UniProtKB/Swiss-Prot annotation:
The lineage of its organism: Bacteria, Pseudomonadati, Pseudomonadota, Alphaproteobacteria, Rhodobacterales. Gene3D superfamilies: GHMP Kinase, N-terminal domain (3.30.230.70). Phosphate binds at R86, G124, T125, R126. GO terms for biological process: rRNA catabolic process; rRNA processing; tRNA processing. Belongs to the RNase PH family. Phosphorolytic 3'-5' exoribonuclease that plays an important role in tRNA 3'-end maturation. Removes nucleotide residues following the 3'-CCA terminus of tRNAs; can also add nucleotides to the ends of RNA molecules by using nucleoside diphosphates as substrates, but this may not be physiologically important. Probably plays a role in initiation of 16S rRNA degradation (leading to ribosome degradation) during starvation. It comes from Cereibacter sphaeroides (strain KD131 / KCTC 12085) (Rhodobacter sphaeroides). This is Ribonuclease PH. It catalyses: tRNA(n+1) + phosphate = tRNA(n) + a ribonucleoside 5'-diphosphate. Homohexameric ring arranged as a trimer of dimers. One of its GO terms (molecular function) is tRNA nucleotidyltransferase activity.
Amino acid sequence: MRPSGRKLDQMRSVSIEPNVMKHAEGSCLIRMGETHVLCSASIEDKPPPFLKNTGLGWVTAEYGMLPRATTSRNRREAAAGKQSGRTQEIQRLIGRALRAGVDRSALGERQIVIDCDVLQADGGTRCASITGGWVALRLAVNKLLKAGIIVSDPIVDNVAAVSCGIYAGQPVLDLDYAEDSTAGTDGNFVLTGRSRMIEVQMSAEGASFSRDEMGQLLDLAEAGIAELVAAQKAALG
């Protein structure tokens, strides 16, 4: 039995509320159970220096957690004067994942920055950030298209992410914190709307896993991604 009472293949409730920020070109609030992440997309009219005069655009991400997103207060990283290794790893993952769904030549020489701020954390914050970040990105690109700033849609497919793991000896979908903190194996799966893999991160936390178990987790992830893509489409109308 899962702590939440969910079935092994059952996602947490998912909702994506678009256009929640006045100034950002794209934004949404994604809720996956008790994990809530505010995602925004900001368009910058020039690319990073390493892409100057290449005709290519860029998508990057920044990630952070509010001090009281967790059960006890975490000190702001700005107050500490540096980002943790975890934060840097997660924001690089978000950027990589979202770039995989973009034709950067169609985007042109500009950069879109995705900011993901965790309001409340209960496991799966990086996956929620990728899924919500894509919605914010899609909304920002829509504004570029509507304004005639770009003529071809650079978004080639949806991008979403979900966690899966081995909990109490059973493969489960969409781990919350109670499961994630005690899972024998856990992984993050980033897929496109067509179920093509962008990134798979799996690690044995308490017990090694078999190839068959990895396949079972991938099957769960594909089903979960399908639900998330449907939520993305519903949010966009």
